Amino acid sequence: MRAVCGIDSVLARRKHSINNAFGGDTMLHSRDRILTTHCGSLPRPAELTRLYADRSAGKSVDEAALATLGKQAMNWVVPQQIASGIDIGNNGEQQREAFFLYVRHRMSGFGGAWNRRIFADVTKYAGYRAQQAAAHAATVAVSNTGTLPQAIGAVKYLDRAMVEAECDDFRFCLDAQENGFAEPFFTAPSPGIIAAAMLNAFYDNEQAYLDALGEALRVEYETIVRSGFLLQIDAPDLAMERHLTYQDRPLSDFLEFVERVVGTINRALVNIPRDRVRLHVCWGNYEGPHDCDVPLQDVLPVLLHANVGGLVLPFANPRHAHEYHVLEKLTLHPDQIIVAGVIDPLTHFIEHPEVVAERIERVVRAVGDPTRVIAGVDCGFDTSAGRGKVADDVVWAKMSAMAEGARIASARLF
């Protein structure tokens, strides 16, 4: 195993990247076999989760211990991904408490607290709602729906040092691996999910809030790409908010929101080539009825206006598994790839590799080109610390099943 690289080499890489603007290798395609990836968040150790939950609840925690545990967890999940057959992997989001809430530590303007509305499908089924509430009450976790901060002042990115350190830690870990990823990726949230989940109590209107968020997130997006990583923007808002914020409003109102967010994302990506970005969209990472979800065919036409090189969409869960057919009618742009969810992160069922292969092949038939399809997971395994449902050893078994399924599909497709 190679020694971990020193800070000088990291700084040299960063300087090289900056000097070359935002160029770099084109996003990987499945040139001679189906590649594998996932959506970002991976199971966190119990003690790390406890510290994140305590801090999120307003309790004082040992920040040095938290940082150490986060780095240790990241150093563990990277080789686990490699051993499980992941080609395009990341840091597991171990150094963040949740996929979007971490921005409150990197941006000004957030404070106070509020609670989000309840999902329409959760309200619809009282028995399920009671069961879910009991399960959450018994879990040590960071909530991404309750006691959330609000925008109470001007939102600005405070200091890129935090995201640079997170990128550097990931790079150090990658350099220590005998065999690394074919391509590393790094996640950051959509301005839309922050605008929806972290209530605007400062700006005159939603667009002004989105503009401020887009400008702040541009710092993070550009730093990630400058550091040599593929950027994944996590945007559940572009589907999920239909049955959350917009559950009592016309579909047209929701689609206008999607258009506003996509426009904001595009402006935030103005300096980044589209082939260095993929956009992850889903209907909410919870095991619920999901019978209030907006159909993919309604939102995909707007998503195709995003200036990104790939879309990451869920096709493994039983509510949306059929929607790969939408790709037959609403085709991707010629330069775009699709990361197709073929693994469900909300169940302990380990998908049979043949099932995975069949799911991959269905999407390939819809798209018409195996080189533009990558196998993935519907969503993260622990999008908010402690909320993950699948035990970590089963997570790695599911990843391995995906890799084997990709090999089976590749033998039939190439």
Over which residues does each language-model region extend?
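Basic polycationic patches enriched in arginine
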Residues: 2, 13-14
